[in-house]
Amino acid sequence: MIKIYKHTGGPPHRMTLPTPEPNRLPYWLRRLWPIYCFLAALVTFGYALYDPYQIDGDAVSYMDIGDLIRAHNWHGIINGYWNPLYPAALSLGHTIFHSTRYNELHAYYMVNFGIFLLEMLAIVAFTDALVQLRELREDSKSLLPPFLLDRYTLRYLGVDILLISTQRELSMGKVRPDALLQAFLLLGLAALLKHLATSHLRYAALMGIALGLAYLTKSFAFLFTFLCIIALVVFRVAWQRYAVPRAVAAGLLALICFAIVAGPYIAALSKQKGRFDFGDSGNLNYAWFVSGTEKMHLQPDQTSSFGAAEVHLTHPNKILLKSPVVVSYKQLPYGTDPDWFDASFWNDRIKAHMDPRLQVPVTIACLVRILRYIANHPEAWLLLAVLFLIGARLRLDWRPGANAFWLTPILLGAGVFCIYSMVNVEDRYIAFGFLAVLLPAFAALRHSGKVPVSAQNAASAVVLLLALLAVGESARIVGELRRNLKVAQSPAGWYDPDTYGAARALNALGVGPGDTVACIGDRACLDTHYWARLAGVRILTEIYKPAETPVYSALADMPNRDQVIDTVRSQGGKVLVGYFTPGVMTGTNPVSAGWRELDSSPFYALPLNLPAAPSRDNSRP
């Protein structure tokens, strides 16, 4: 029997299935991106205001070169150990903020903040280039699952890792070029990936320019540039099946642009040294850390201290006294501390030789430091573990013709680790390598194929959460730094009461700009000699002592202490400055007699050639 139902009018009723709500997360990732960048910049600006004093001998050398740039003393700027671009940035900041010696650190912290903004731009350029190459290399007929992280998610991740690095090894208080180097290396790598994605020669040229600027920041980029050019040619030929002449032409264009930017400085340095020279820092550090060559005050007759290096010194330190070693630095007319202003001057003609017996233990120690760095940056690895738990899979197809977009940046990042593991590894050296390996690895993550599309939303949400937590943690740290300043009643984060107090006390004694002084001990002479720059004086004589021996003990154990003091006095320095353990300089014994405490700090000064009355003209900065 067939039942017929009467239609009562209107359209017939249709069965409707529930439709999924539109995916709003990508929309909010795009909308929140400018706000997140603003928050990241804001908390980093807080670091620039409140980060504590972290000045060392390297920082003073960069500041001194910046002074020479402002004075247009081009001969003094050419330096085989420190490159000029970061000092030029410091000089620009000094000029913009109209700084004096006593407040210049504020300007330099602001320069570091500007470099952080450049790093953010470089991160965006790098991640966007990664995604562009990834999408263009993906075969539309590929049966592989889609990629897990989109362009904006990778941006958040990159800035998040940068912000964490700024909390640690690349902090605002470190007046060093590593952050600027990282920015230019990232821009160079981004240009390389853009060229691989588009075949446009302008990106090869931009790569050469960015790497040239990286070289002017730090000579490490000289070797890295050639690795990038080789990677460009090999990837174009082997993976993209381009003709060899076209790939080589792009590499030559990058090399020409690099030479245009870096060539004049290399030519000037080579002329100064009398040989082709792009920088001596790598060679000297290899000699010091691997070959076992003596680092400080090496003399031509100290053959037992040459280690495995070949040594033919052209202008070693002038030794005034052998026991203890008293050294004069009058040969070099530049720098607050000429000994560290240009280490390549005093150690010219040291040629390091590779020795596997010496290399192996050094490399093992460097690998341990790399593992320690990875352990000290667990956030990214924990994120990777969470993404694997929600279904992410890492499929790295490296075969020619495959979508191996990740291969070039990961190999170049690994190259950074390999280069530094041959000599010496510090966290700030390998931060770029960490980014160059990690971000492409995250970009290569795909869905497992068995997980719904919602897994991508979960992955993006986890990355966003980590990025916001990094901003929140930075805000907490900045707030704590600000509270500490109020408790200590310090005028600024960059202010160190001992260092600034010692400099003002020296000025009050009549020691000021244009004067020379002597020092004793590694703390006063090398590690914390910013007091001399603040006071406006140059350290031209040093009583050298081993780092492990306290200064007071070294003075007490000198059988010829009076002869040593007379030798130092004969060099014309106004005072002898040392950094002493608090409480030992009582003034009641022959060792401490005559020494003057400098403004309740651990710094003390022994008058040598002071005028009868302090000069008021030199008492102010």
Model-derived features: positions:
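Extracytoplasmic catalytic/substrate-binding loops of multi-pass membrane glycan-assembly enzymes
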Residues: 51-65, 76-93, 99-106, 273-280, ...
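Membrane-embedded, lumen/periplasm-facing catalytic core of multi-pass transferases
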Residues: 70, 272, 276, 458, ...
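Transmembrane-helix motifs of polytopic, lipid-linked glycan transferases
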Residues: 107-146, 187
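Membrane-interface transmembrane helices that cradle and orient dolichyl/undecaprenyl
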Residues: 148-149, 188-204, 214, 236-240, ...
